[in-house]
Curated annotation (Swiss-Prot):
Subcellular location: Nucleus; Cytoplasm, Cytoskeleton, Spindle; Chromosome, Centromere, Kinetochore
Subunit structure: Component of the DASH complex consisting of ASK1, DAD1, DAD2, DAD3, DAD4, DAM1, DUO1, HSK3, SPC19 and SPC34, with a stoichiometry of one copy of each subunit per complex. Multiple DASH complexes oligomerize to form a ring that encircles spindle microtubules and organizes the rod-like NDC80 complexes of the outer kinetochore. DASH complex oligomerization strengthens microtubule attachments. On cytoplasmic microtubules, DASH complexes appear to form patches instead of rings.
UniProt keyword Cell cycle, yes or no: yes
Family label: Belongs to the DASH complex DAD1 family.
Alphabetical keyword list: Cell cycle, Cell division, Centromere, Chromosome, Chromosome partition, Cytoplasm, Cytoskeleton, Kinetochore, Microtubule, Mitosis, Nucleus
Gene: DAD1
Descriptive protein name: DASH complex subunit DAD1
One GO cellular component term noted in the UniProt record for this chain: DASH complex
Keyword Kinase assigned: no
Length: 88
């Protein structure tokens, strides 16, 4: 075997074909990066929505507690707050 056939030194493709293949590789790598970033964004948004729903539940619970406590309080003429003991 000749050494030239084992290790070809010149590419048989044209300059256009080599450049096209390089651009396709670059575009493919960029699209993969975009996909990975979109997946990370999606996970972040899902996490944010989950936290938002939990905070709404917590806010509703505190609102209910505040309204329940407020029903039993009465403001006196001098501005003090007292518990209304007349309700049963």
């Amino acid at each position: 075997m000749s050494r030239v056939s084992m290790f070809p030194t010149e590419d048989k493709r044209s300059y256009f074909e080599r450049q096209r293949d390089q651009y396709i590789k670059n575009i493919s790598a960029s699209m993969e990066d975009v996909l990975n970033n979109l997946n990370a964004l999606n996970r972040s948004l899902e996490h944010t929505v989950g936290l938002s729903q939990k905070s709404e539940e917590l806010a509703e619970m505190w609102s209910h507690f505040y309204n329940t406590v407020n029903e039993d309080l009465v403001k006196t003429e001098d501005g003090d707050i007292e518990v209304d003991t007349t309700k049963e």
